[in-house]
């Protein structure tokens, strides 16, 4: 998956670090990042290209990969456009970076977007509208007027691979009103007051009207596009396989043969990685949770 950058080491410890000319600066416009792609390899501008230094005050340290520092900067559009003109740089959608390499640079550009999206929406206090200032000791925006503190937020969500044991088919869906039209697995965000296992039962019932059992935890993945932490689960159909599709969320859903699941060598997302496991019939390698007592809650959503 895209976050697997070993042997490189990602470190997100907060520090008041000043940029050096050889450090990397990540510059975003909407959901796109400024990048150069040469022979399939990604690179980002250096801080020196925009004269970012300790006196500029225009950047914030994000993280390091190995010993190399990455900064986020808000630079005047005219200055960026002048830099881009006649260069190999352009703005790429962060969601498309996975098609290139090296993996650590793909990860940097995608994770940088999570930081960018958070900082971009934390300019003013949500309580009193005073401009926020960055805390000096941790990654937190503080209101100098009312003291309100804003920490980075991750939104927990689930990806669910559902198998019908009686037919050995897998449930897939397509999102409604989205550009992405390939097969996906059932997915959704956790709501306040529920466990992540309860999220699985609720989302499956809401989106396709099914009950499931034997939840088996697979793995997690940070997902920058939605600032989410994804939890992957495999499970089995419990009862009737007839689908009641929520067309506000899904364009359609269907049971398909395992061999029909999309598969390629990238597997950059948790969804694609789980589809690979399902194609290879390896979901049984992951033991069901010792206690999954959400049957009654599941039924309450029918």
Please name every model-derived segment:
Residues 1-122, 179-183, 246-302:
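Nudix hydrolase/Nudix homology domain
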Residues 60-66, 141-143, 160-162, 223:
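Short acidic-hydrophobic surface loop/beta-edge motif
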Residues 111-163:
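Cys/His-rich short segments
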Residues 141-184, 189, 211-212, 235-237:
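N-terminal strand-loop-strand
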Residues 174-175, 187, 216-221, 237, ...:
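Active-site proximal loops enriched in glycine and acidic residues that flank catalytic Cys/His/Asp
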Residues 184-219, 233:
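The catalytic Nudix box helix
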Residues 221-244:
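Active-site-adjacent beta-strand/loop module that shapes the phosphate/pyrophosphate-binding cleft
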């Amino acid at each position: 998956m895209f976050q697997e950058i070993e042997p490189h080491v990602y470190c997100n410890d907060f520090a008041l670090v000043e940029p050096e000319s050889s450090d990397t600066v990540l510059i975003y416009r909407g959901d796109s990042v400024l990048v150069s792609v040469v022979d399939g390899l990604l690179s980002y501008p250096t801080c020196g290209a925009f004269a970012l230094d300790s006196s500029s005050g225009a950047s914030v340290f994000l993280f390091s990969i190995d010993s190399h520092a990455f900064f986020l900067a808000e630079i005047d559009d005219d200055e960026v456009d002048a830099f881009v003109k006649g260069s190999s740089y352009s703005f790429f959608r962060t969601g498309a970076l996975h098609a290139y390499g090296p993996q650590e640079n793909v990860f940097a550009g995608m994770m940088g977007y999570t930081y960018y999206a958070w900082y971009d929406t934390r300019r003013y206090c949500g309580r009193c509208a005073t401009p926020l200032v960055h805390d000096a000791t941790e990654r937190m925006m503080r209101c100098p007027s009312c003291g309100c503190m804003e920490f980075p937020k991750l939104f927990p969500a689930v990806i669910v691979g559902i198998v019908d044991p009686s037919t050995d088919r897998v449930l897939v869906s397509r999102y409604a009103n989205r550009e992405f039209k390939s097969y996906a697995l059932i997915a959704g965000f956790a709501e306040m007051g529920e466990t992540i296992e309860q999220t699985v039962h609720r989302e499956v019932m809401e989106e396709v009207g099914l009950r499931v059992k034997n939840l088996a935890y697979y793995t997690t993945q940070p997902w920058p596009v939605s600032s989410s932490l994804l939890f992957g689960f495999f499970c089995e159909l419990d009862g009737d396989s007839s689908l009641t599709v929520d067309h506000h969320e899904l364009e359609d859903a269907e049971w398909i043969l395992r061999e029909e699941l999309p598969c390629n060598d990238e597997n950059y997302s948790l969804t694609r990685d789980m589809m690979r496991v399902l194609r290879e019939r390896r979901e049984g390698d992951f033991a069901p949770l010792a206690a999954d007592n959400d049957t009654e809650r599941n039924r309450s959503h029918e």
